[in-house]
UniProtKB/Swiss-Prot annotation:
Fe cation binds at residues 187, 286. It comes from Legionella pneumophila (strain Corby). Pathway: Porphyrin-containing compound metabolism; protoheme biosynthesis; protoheme from protoporphyrin-IX: step 1/1. Its EC number is 4.98.1.1. Coiled coil: none annotated. GO terms for biological process: heme biosynthetic process. It is found in: Cytoplasm. GO terms for molecular function: ferrochelatase activity; metal ion binding. This is Ferrochelatase. GO terms for cellular component: cytoplasm.
Amino acid sequence: MRRGLLLLNLGTPDNADIRAVKLYLREFLTDKRVIDLPTIPRYILVYCLILPFRSPKSAQAYQSIWTEKGSPLLYHSQNLVTKLQSALKDEYKIALGMRYGTPSITTALAELKDCHSLTILPLFPQYSSAATGSAIEKTLSYLANQEIIPSIKIIRDFYQRPEYIQAQAKIMKPYIKDNFHVLFSYHGIPERHIHKSGCDTLCPQTCTPIYDKNQACYRAQCYQTSLLLAKELQLGTHQYTTAFQSRLGKTPWIKPYTDEIFAELISKGIKNIVVSCPSFVADCLETLEEIGIRAKEQWEKLGGEQFILTPCMNDHPEWIKAIHSIVNEQI
């Protein structure tokens, strides 16, 4: 009997025109785990305020990174599946499901319907309800309606796994030069999501080490990721900074904000930076456009000189080896 491996990621529009982007954003932003408001206020916010104004801007952003192969997130993810299947051979049958857009989680699970056991790996190193939680919920809701439910294993997060840290560090290392400051930029989430994760307090600066009460805290996991990467890369505490990007709306999101940390770094005399985005395993809008284009322009306008964005792990051989190890340890 065959084992199934379901890889989950967030998703991408089918193409970069306004209509496709609007459809994608509608599915994404009406998710109750993403915008955690009651249904009616959430729909009013999304349909009346966000979609009419954000869709054209987002479409323009997607167009700036779209390639002949299509969406970078999608083709990197598909390449990962192909290479991982080749590496794992008959150990697993692998399918890719996107929480929003295509290929859908439903389609991916249909591909794995003959598997007697299923390992679910959301490709989000750090746990958040809005990304990991939503993808797992969608998967389990589909499985709950099946006549035969396979044995299920869920890998909730893997930020602390040595294989992930080593793979991320190996990809970063060639880009780190003398006199360059390293910025770890993670996707942000609203502060209220932190309180919902079980944390009693929101740490004013760096988060405390992981313990029982903050083990599901996204911000704490991000800071722990930075600490582990810095150790692997042999960076001193003064050689790197952690920040959070991609905030939406006017409510407080976890800090410090990536777009506000640049001025602080410049004021300290830092002119050259290497930026890595460890919460993203594949290059996408948030890495290529938000950081690779807009953040770089901002850095240069502030007087910064060199700005290097390291690639995500994408379908790198070290990442494939890491997934193989992480998945097999769950058996």
